[in-house]
Amino acid sequence: IIPGIGSTDVAKNNWAGIAIGSALAGTGLTIGENVVGMDMEAVVKEGRVTDTRDLKRRVKLYQDHQIDGYGAIVVQANVEDTRLGAQEYAVRELGVKCVELKWGQGAKNIGGEVKIKDLAKAQELSRRGYIVLPDPNSEAVITAFQRGTFRECERHSRIGMVEEEAFARRVEELRAAGAKYVFLKTGAYRPADLARSIAWSWKYGLDLITVDGAGGGTGMSPWHM
């Protein structure tokens, strides 16, 4: 399975080759975090996504080239994706069968930030539930931006933390929405945390765990862990 490739330009600009190639090979492919939230053409009503451009395109490219049902397209979600209902939308509207929960920032100690140079986009991301710094809705910030005092905001994704009750509830919600397979992606954290992820995944019937590498991975990796 190809691990999560999310909203970055590297993924977006090369998605056709990745999706079609992995589908023809019968290899699973994971759509990473923030794809819905960063899609400025996505339709979000009352805090929940009802239509998308980017996610729909990514899923369809894979599905259209699958052979005899081999492989799988997987939709990953972080905190913001979950609040937007991205996985429920993918399952119900796009026919996705596999979803992946994400703890932390995978192989990264911290991170999840993106530079936003367009004030209107920063404001929309704030409305969609992201942490945007400085606050793009502040009158003082708007004035300073228009004067050229600064030229970009930072969008931050929240670090996914979990308690057992909430984890069990989320797995059940995804099953009820129609997900056939539920995966978990976590990092190479403390042995106690790895043991917890394995124990809970077994207890609540998850189908696959991905342990993101401490010596590699994506984004700001590798880090000494």
Locate the predicted segments by residue.
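N-terminal capping/small domains of soluble enzymes
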Residues: 1-125
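Residue-level detector of functional hotspots within protein domains
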Residues: 13, 85-89, 145, 153, ...
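Carboxylate/His-rich catalytic cores and anion/metal-binding grooves
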Residues: 111-116, 123-133, 196-211
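Serine/threonine-rich low-complexity intrinsically disordered regions
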Residues: 51, 115-118, 135-138, 164, ...
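Glycine-rich, proline-tolerant flexible connector loops at the mouths of alpha/beta enzymes
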Residues: 32-49, 103-106, 131-132, 137, ...
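Glycine-rich phosphate/ribose-binding loops and adjacent secondary-structure elements
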Residues: 147-225
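Sequence-level detector for tyrosine residue identity
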Residues: 62, 70, 89, 130, ...
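Short low-complexity stretches enriched in small and charged residues
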Residues: 53-58, 136-141, 162-169
